[in-house]
Amino acid sequence: MVRVKRGNVARKRRKKILKLAKGFRGSHSKLFTAANQQVMKALRNAYRHRRTKKRDFRSLWIVRINAQARTEGLSYSRLIDGLHKADVALNRKMLAQLAVTDPEAFAEVARVAKSARPV
């Protein structure tokens, strides 16, 4: 029976992992077993944090909107409620951008939200 030689396949597999581990410290970028564990952990964390990043940014936007809304005499929830009632189609990312870069425009949006809510 013919012998199966796996030298090229095994080398390619190991080189792929070591290439992914480039920049890791110490044996985590030099030795295959340690590098393989660290690469798997890094990929798992990257997958997990791509999802938490979305939650973190939404929280940041809400904090920024709330801070600017309170200078206009509204709470965050009342601002959002007023915008929904006024059919203003601005999402939280846009509102946060306005709050940071253009407070005058945000004040106008807050005025629209105030007028849409009954007192």
From Swiss-Prot:
Q: Domain of life here?
A: Bacteria
Task: Name residues in a coiled coil.
Answer: none
Q: Which UniProt keywords apply?
A: Ribonucleoprotein, Ribosomal protein, RNA-binding, rRNA-binding
Spell out the GO cellular component terms annotated for this protein, sorted alphabetically and separated by semicolons: cytosolic large ribosomal subunit
User: Which GO terms of the molecular function aspect are on file?
Assistant: rRNA binding; structural constituent of ribosome
InterPro entries from the UniProt entry: Ribosomal_bL20, RIBOSOMAL_L20_CS, Ribosomal_protein_bL20_C
Statement: the UniProt record of this protein carries the keyword Ribonucleoprotein: yes
Check the record and name the Pfam families matching this protein: Ribosomal_L20
The Gene Ontology biological process terms listed for this entry are:
ribosomal large subunit assembly; translation
Q: Which PANTHER family has this protein been placed in?
A: 39S RIBOSOMAL PROTEIN L20
Main function: Binds directly to 23S ribosomal RNA and is necessary for the in vitro assembly process of the 50S ribosomal subunit. It is not involved in the protein synthesizing functions of that subunit.
What the record says about family reads: Belongs to the bacterial ribosomal protein bL20 family.
Q: What is this protein called?
A: Large ribosomal subunit protein bL20
